[in-house]
Amino acid sequence: MMNESQPKLKYKRILLKFSGEALMGKSQFGIDPSVLDSLARDIAELIHMGVEVGLVLGGGNLFRGKALSQAGVGRVTGDHMGMLATVMNALALRDALERIDLPARIMSAIPMLGVVDPYHRRKAITHLRNGQVVIFAAGTGNPFFTTDTAACLRAIEIGADIVLKATKVDGVYSADPLKNPDAKRYDYLTYKEVLTKGLEVMDSTAICLCQDQGMPLQVFDMAAPKALKRIVTGERVGTIVGANHDQ
């Protein structure tokens, strides 16, 4: 629970989007246990501050549908395989959270009786209010929708204050900063600017969904010291995307 010595929270309920690739650490495949444990500790710090935390994990560390698609595997089949990869990542993160005595629930868009709970909006909100971390798995349960879109959808459904997208760079740039030294980093962007400039924040479906519902986004470097704690207490870290630059 939050006490008087803790800083005031700007965001009390968040949806954290963490890519599957980030879980690999420096490896080329799979899950780096040190990354998983670090993420669990960061989440625990938020819970102890009184923040309600929902998560969506990607699955790119375990499965990438593009290669199979090029080999002739259908898009729908590939997307379903990718959804299952996100469930595997969710199971790993739940285990890491429970090892530090942090209660967590996995809610899957694809029913998997005996493995994870089926997604249920009202139950998810109840779990969050009770201090449990809720990991939303299997995307939206439908092909052709990314985990970014799933993250924005779940954030809107549970009434989150913001979507936080953890990446390997410190915000959104006008071009790839690794390839273009003149690339400009943005502090603030509107949804319209993201769409018209074609910036790689999230796919257009996710951005349009957030725009329609007024859900702000913040893109940040997960490796930045105390990034999540700084964000929920109102510090600007990375790039904020909203209806205007005064978000």
From Swiss-Prot:
Binding site for UMP: 59, 79, 140-147
Catalyzed reactions per annotation: UMP + ATP = UDP + ADP
CDD domains, alphabetized: AAK_UMPK-PyrH-Ec
GO MF entries: ATP binding; UMP kinase activity
GO CC aspect terms: cytosol
Enzyme Commission number(s) from the entry: 2.7.4.22
Pfam families (alphabetical): AA_kinase
Chief subcellular location: cytoplasm
Protein localization: Cytoplasm
Biological processes annotated in GO: 'de novo' CTP biosynthetic process; UDP biosynthetic process
Regulation of this protein's activity per its record: Inhibited by UTP.
Record pathway: Pyrimidine metabolism; CTP biosynthesis via de novo pathway; UDP from UMP (UMPK route): step 1/1
Family matches, as InterPro entries: AceGlu_kinase-like_sf, Asp/Glu/Uridylate_kinase, Uridylate_kinase, Uridylate_kinase_bac
Domain of life: Bacteria
Binding site for ATP: 17-20, 60, 64, 167, 173, 176
Keywords of this entry: ATP-binding, Cytoplasm, Kinase, Nucleotide-binding, Pyrimidine biosynthesis, Transferase
HAMAP family: PyrH_B (MF_01220_B)
Role, per record: Catalyzes the reversible phosphorylation of UMP to UDP.
Subunit structure: Homohexamer.
Similarity annotation: Belongs to the UMP kinase family.
Name of the protein in its database record: Uridylate kinase
Organism: Legionella pneumophila (strain Lens)
Gene, per the UniProt record: pyrH
